[in-house]
């Protein structure tokens, strides 16, 4: 079943010059297509919409601060089982626990600065795509 998902290449991926490598890995996998790509710096409103469910948790403020620290690359990726697949390609949130061959396993350093965000379900993908690409949903 074809799906769409949101992928964010976080400020650490942009700062470290890894966006091209990560995008190449996504494009090479399973015939997925990148149908939208945008470089942007996230404002407070967008970050609150995206991470609002975590407000009040100890990691919320540092996460929002990190995500506002530099530009991100936002992508819409489409293809068969793309939601599950991109998350597998990214690897676990903690780069130390991520296997070699995954994006975080190969390039990740710490949990908060873990290079990539990918929607975790069809519902999340739909909600997140409306935030980042409102004209494409």
UniProtKB/Swiss-Prot annotation:
<feature type="binding site">
    <location>
        <position position="87"/>
    </location>
    <ligand>
        <name>ATP</name>
    </ligand>
</feature>
<keyword id="KW-0808">Transferase</keyword>
<dbReference type="GO" id="GO:0005524">
    <property type="term" value="F:ATP binding"/>
</dbReference>
<feature type="binding site">
    <location>
        <position position="104"/>
    </location>
    <ligand>
        <name>ATP</name>
    </ligand>
</feature>
<dbReference type="InterPro" id="IPR036850">
    <property type="entry name" value="NDK-like_dom_sf"/>
</dbReference>
<comment type="similarity">
    <text>Belongs to the NDK family.</text>
</comment>
<dbReference type="GO" id="GO:0006228">
    <property type="term" value="P:UTP biosynthetic process"/>
</dbReference>
<feature type="active site" description="Pros-phosphohistidine intermediate">
    <location>
        <position position="117"/>
    </location>
</feature>
<protein>
    <recommendedName>
        <fullName>Nucleoside diphosphate kinase</fullName>
        <ecNumber>2.7.4.6</ecNumber>
    </recommendedName>
</protein>
<keyword id="KW-0963">Cytoplasm</keyword>
<dbReference type="GO" id="GO:0006241">
    <property type="term" value="P:CTP biosynthetic process"/>
</dbReference>
<feature type="binding site">
    <location>
        <position position="93"/>
    </location>
    <ligand>
        <name>ATP</name>
    </ligand>
</feature>
<comment type="subunit">
    <text>Homotetramer.</text>
</comment>
<keyword id="KW-0546">Nucleotide metabolism</keyword>
<dbReference type="InterPro" id="IPR034907">
    <property type="entry name" value="NDK-like_dom"/>
</dbReference>
<feature type="binding site">
    <location>
        <position position="114"/>
    </location>
    <ligand>
        <name>ATP</name>
    </ligand>
</feature>
<dbReference type="InterPro" id="IPR023005">
    <property type="entry name" value="Nucleoside_diP_kinase_AS"/>
</dbReference>
<keyword id="KW-0597">Phosphoprotein</keyword>
<feature type="binding site">
    <location>
        <position position="10"/>
    </location>
    <ligand>
        <name>ATP</name>
    </ligand>
</feature>
<dbReference type="InterPro" id="IPR001564">
    <property type="entry name" value="Nucleoside_diP_kinase"/>
</dbReference>
<dbReference type="GO" id="GO:0005737">
    <property type="term" value="C:cytoplasm"/>
</dbReference>
<keyword id="KW-0460">Magnesium</keyword>
<feature type="binding site">
    <location>
        <position position="59"/>
    </location>
    <ligand>
        <name>ATP</name>
    </ligand>
</feature>
<keyword id="KW-0547">Nucleotide-binding</keyword>
<dbReference type="GO" id="GO:0006183">
    <property type="term" value="P:GTP biosynthetic process"/>
</dbReference>
<comment type="function">
    <text>Major role in the synthesis of nucleoside triphosphates other than ATP. The ATP gamma phosphate is transferred to the NDP beta phosphate via a ping-pong mechanism, using a phosphorylated active-site intermediate.</text>
</comment>
<keyword id="KW-0067">ATP-binding</keyword>
<dbReference type="Pfam" id="PF00334">
    <property type="entry name" value="NDK"/>
</dbReference>
<keyword id="KW-0418">Kinase</keyword>
<dbReference type="GO" id="GO:0046872">
    <property type="term" value="F:metal ion binding"/>
</dbReference>
<dbReference type="GO" id="GO:0004550">
    <property type="term" value="F:nucleoside diphosphate kinase activity"/>
</dbReference>
<keyword id="KW-0479">Metal-binding</keyword>
């Amino acid at each position: 079943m074809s799906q769409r998902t949101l992928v964010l290449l976080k400020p650490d991926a942009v700062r470290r010059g890894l966006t091209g490598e990560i995008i190449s890995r996504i494009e090479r996998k399973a015939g997925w297509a990148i149908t939208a790509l945008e470089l942007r710096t996230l404002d407070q409103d967008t970050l609150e919409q995206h991470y609002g469910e975590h407000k009040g948790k100890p990691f919320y403020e540092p996460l929002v601060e990190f995500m506002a620290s530099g530009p991100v690359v936002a992508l819409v990726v489409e293809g068969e089982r793309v939601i599950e697949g991109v998350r597998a390609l990214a690897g676990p949130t903690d780069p130390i626990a991520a296997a070699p061959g995954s994006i975080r396993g190969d390039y990740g350093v710490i949990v908060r600065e873990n290079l990539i965000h990918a929607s975790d379900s069809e519902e999340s993908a739909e909600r997140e795509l409306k935030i980042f690409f409102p004209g494409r949903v």
